[in-house]
Amino acid sequence: MSLSDPIADMLTRIRNAQQAKHELCVIPGSKIKKSILDLLKEEGFVDDVQTVKNGSFDDFQVKLKYDTEKKPVIRMIERVSTPGRRVYIQSGEIRPFRNNIGTLILSTSKGVMTGKRARKLRVGGEVLCKVF
């Protein structure tokens, strides 16, 4: 099956799994997805990310995170730049998102990173998604 936007598919799988109160979510693997998932883990939005062999391909098994009342930690996860409408931002235009509670994830010339880190390194790039 051909996907026109695999990152949006990954974000939708996470969103749907959390709404259904699933503990785990399986996502087909790629390097950019791994980078995004590692950032989500680093920022505390997911508990764990493991690589699972699926034949000759790798899948990612994401352990979703919930608060004490069984509400998802990720309140909103949204794709910003799409294949049909790319959104780029300069380092000076990167602002705190949702009073520094939310996170922008950017693809820069120095790799995939959060908006905070990109602002610190003074690099801009493509806004992949925002998470709150």
UniProtKB/Swiss-Prot annotation:
Part of the 30S ribosomal subunit. Contacts proteins S5 and S12. One of the primary rRNA binding proteins, it binds directly to 16S rRNA central domain where it helps coordinate assembly of the platform of the 30S subunit. Keywords: Ribonucleoprotein, Ribosomal protein, RNA-binding, rRNA-binding. It holds the Pfam family Ribosomal_S8. One of its GO terms (biological process) is translation. The keyword Acyltransferase does not apply. GO terms for cellular component: ribonucleoprotein complex; ribosome. This is Small ribosomal subunit protein uS8. InterPro entries: Ribosomal_uS8, Ribosomal_uS8_CS, Ribosomal_uS8_sf. The gene is rpsH. It comes from Leptospira biflexa serovar Patoc (strain Patoc 1 / ATCC 23582 / Paris). It comes from the Bacteria. Belongs to the universal ribosomal protein uS8 family. The keyword rRNA-binding applies. GO terms for molecular function: rRNA binding; structural constituent of ribosome.
